[in-house]
Amino acid sequence: MEHKVICVLAVVLMLAFGSLAQAQAQAQAQEETCIMAPRERINCGFPGVTAQQCTERGCCFDDSVRGFPWCFHPMAIENTQEEECPF
């Protein structure tokens, strides 16, 4: 009985760590898409938009640069398809 409990606990921990790793990877990917030159930003909000309202729209928020949109669409990441080697 004790071995079954340990096995179940091990499976639950592995699933939890897997979910956590996936969430961190998605968060990192989101951050990477928001990094761009201010002149490349395409407005996604409205005057006076808050960071929370902006992120709820699925957009990026950065109010550190005046004169450019603070709430803006994330940069699209191009999916690079794997090429098969002709070997």
From Swiss-Prot:
Transmembrane segments: none annotated. InterPro entries: P_trefoil_chordata, P_trefoil_CS, P_trefoil_dom, P_trefoil_dom_sf. PROSITE patterns: P_TREFOIL_1 (PS00025), P_TREFOIL_2 (PS51448). Residues 32-75 form the P-type domain. The modification Pyrrolidone carboxylic acid is found at Q22. Stabilizer of the mucous gel overlying the gastrointestinal mucosa that provides a physical barrier against various noxious agents. This is Trefoil factor 1. It comes from Mus musculus.
